[in-house]
UniProtKB/Swiss-Prot annotation:
GO terms for molecular function: ATP hydrolysis activity; GTP binding; ribosome binding. Keywords: GTP-binding, Nucleotide-binding, Repeat, Ribosome biogenesis. InterPro entries: AAA+_ATPase (IPR003593), G_ENGA (IPR031166), GTP-bd (IPR006073), GTPase_Der (IPR016484), KH_dom-like (IPR032859), KH_dom-like_a/b (IPR015946), P-loop_NTPase (IPR027417), Small_GTP-bd (IPR005225). GTP 2 binds at residues 211-218, 258-262, 323-326. It holds the Pfam family MMR_HSR1. PROSITE patterns: G_ENGA. This is GTPase Der. Associates with the 50S ribosomal subunit. GTP 1 binds at residues 9-16, 56-60, 118-121. Residues 3-166, 205-378 form the EngA-type G domain. Belongs to the TRAFAC class TrmE-Era-EngA-EngB-Septin-like GTPase superfamily. EngA (Der) GTPase family. Disulfide bonds: none annotated. The lineage of its organism: Bacteria, Pseudomonadati, Pseudomonadota, Gammaproteobacteria, Vibrionales.
């Protein structure tokens, strides 16, 4: 059994810094002000050849109001999940009432707990740590997480009871929730496309839930999971990190990615907000399918369209969910649908669902569209079928003339998946106008019944081996030309 280590403490004592140090990532946001981490965030870490799971939590300071009360609940839940608790305190700030309150709670839980005095670099560590003995601990560990001082010794001691059970666990599969590997762009060859297809079949479906702040992303995530896994509060921006959560439904494995709400650039008053947006956009790149949430009670904004554009440019499959649909009268619903048709007509390949994440209305149908979009994006298509469809499209509508010559399409094959890439070979294909390229893309979409995914078509000119060589007559051709030239000359006389 892989041990679970929870990092707890009041705000801004360095929990996220230690999380990043252990997982060797920057997946937990770090900045020099309290309250930055709000959800339980899971990551995989390794000590020598042994693996363990780390949980980063929001801070508890005993003065929680509003959303911070929710954050405290997440921290307490992490304590219950953990096999080992690392209780972090700030060596520079000294002992506080909040530290004493947390220590009291931890004593009541009867969990293996290690007191970790962080930020001891540049100070007299022994003097700074002396007052923390009041917490009644058996052992104290001095670290500087930002500089990796004392971290290895701490983890060796904390994981010592699990050392025997950790041996031989290397073969166990563990999804890395903190640094999910990017799907590589497939090269334009059939062999690499096949390799990309096989790689995708071995992975769970990664579903990123994105949208502007406060449209209901975390509410939907919790509805899907059936627990208060992600902080939900009626205030924009309560999710700042991208949260990776594994789940299974009807035998299909998923990794849900709940992202920070993306807001307009002018509203990003803090560096942290900008960094969260970067994490969101990285989550889109990492996903197989993107579920974009739109607020039914607000007009479609330029930010919604900007997000759509990013998803399409990334080549990710797309499902749209119009949230907060409950409670709207019929007139408002018709107006919203009309607005969607007018402004989102360019993504007619994506399914649109009208849901209430809070009450669960319509949420179950989202899975059908997610599966449909994923299957469309990863559908294996033979070269013969792609070539046959290309020929049918060419017969129905001939390519235009380019410099007095008809463009000729020869054959097509798969070049990659997620998104599907179709490679068409022919003469002068790079000179095809954009209108004919769109025609081919739509023809393939209809013929292959692809729904929920963009299609990319790459064109490659077939090389003419004689294009750069100078034609040279054979001996017999030269004699014939000379004889014909002589005959013409004699007739003129």
């Amino acid at each position: 059994m892989i041990p679970v280590v929870a990092l707890v403490g009041r705000p801004n004592v360095g929990k996220s810094t230690l999380f990043n140090r252990l997982t060797r990532t920057r997946d937990a946001l770090v900045a020099d002000f309290p309250g930055l981490t709000r959800d339980r965030k899971y990551g995989r870490a390794e000590l020598e050849e042994h693996e363990f799971i780390v949980i980063d939590t929001g801070g508890i300071d005993g003065t929680e109001e509003g959303v911070e009360t929710k954050m405290a609940e997440q921290s307490l839940a992490a304590i219950e999940e953990a096999d080992v608790v690392l209780f972090l305190v700030d060596g520079r700030a000294g002992l506080t009432v909040s530290d004493e309150a947390i220590a009291k709670h931890l004593r009541s839980r009867d969990k293996p707990t290690f007191l970790v005095v962080n930020k001891i670099d540049g100070i007299d560590a022994d003097s700074a740590c002396a007052e923390f003995w009041k917490l009644g601990v058996d052992a104290m560990y001095q670290v500087a997480a930002a500089h990796n001082r004392g971290v290895t010794a701490l983890m060796e001691r904390a994981l010592a009871p699990f050392a025997e059970s950790l041996k031989g666990n290397d073969e166990e599969g563990l999804i890395d929730l903190s640094s999910v590997e990017d799907i590589e762009k497939a090269d334009l060859t059939e062999e690499d496309a096949e390799a990309a297809y096989k790689r995708l079949q071995e992975q769970p479906i990664k579903l990123a839930i994105i949208g502007r702040p406060n449209v209901g992303k975390s509410t939907l995530t919790n509805r899907i999971l059936g627990e208060e896994r992600v902080v939900v509060y009626d205030m924009p921006g309560t999710t700042r990190d991208s949260i990776y959560i594994p789940m299974e439904r009807d035998g299909q494995e998923y990794v849900l990615i709940d992202t920070a709400g993306v807001r307009r650039r002018k509203n990003m008053n803090q560096v942290v907000e900008k960094f969260s947006v970067i994490q969101t956009l990285k989550a889109v790149e990492d996903a197989n399918v993107v579920l974009l949430i739109i607020d039914a009670r607000e007009n479609i904004s330029d930010q919604d369209l900007s997000l759509l554009g990013f998803v399409l440019n990334s080549g990710r499959s797309l499902v749209l969910a119009v949230n907060k649909w409950d409670g709207l009268d019929n007139e408002v619903k018709e107006r919203v649908k009309s607005e969607l048709d007018r402004r989102l007509g360019f993504i007619d390949f994506a399914r649109i669902h009208f849901i209430s994440a809070l009450h669960g209305t319509g949420v179950g149908h989202l899975y059908d569209s997610v599966i449909e979009a994923y299957k469309s994006a990863t559908k294996r298509i033979s070269t013969s079928l792609l070539t046959r469809i290309m020929q049918m499209a060419q017969d129905d509508h001939q390519p235009p003339m380019v410099r007095g010559r008809r463009v000729k399409l020869k054959y097509a094959h798969a070049g990659g998946y997620n998104p599907p890439i179709i490679v068409i070979h022919g003469n002068q294909v790079n000179d095809l106008p954009a209108s004919y390229k769109r025609y081919l893309m739509n023809y393939y979409r209809r013929s292959l019944e692809m729904m929920g995914t963009p299609i990319r078509i790459q064109f490659q000119n077939s090389e003419n081996p004689f294009e750069t060589t100078k034609q040279k007559l054979t001996v017999s051709q030269a004699r014939k030309r000379k004889r014909l030239t002589g005959m013409i000359h004699n007739r003129r006389k």
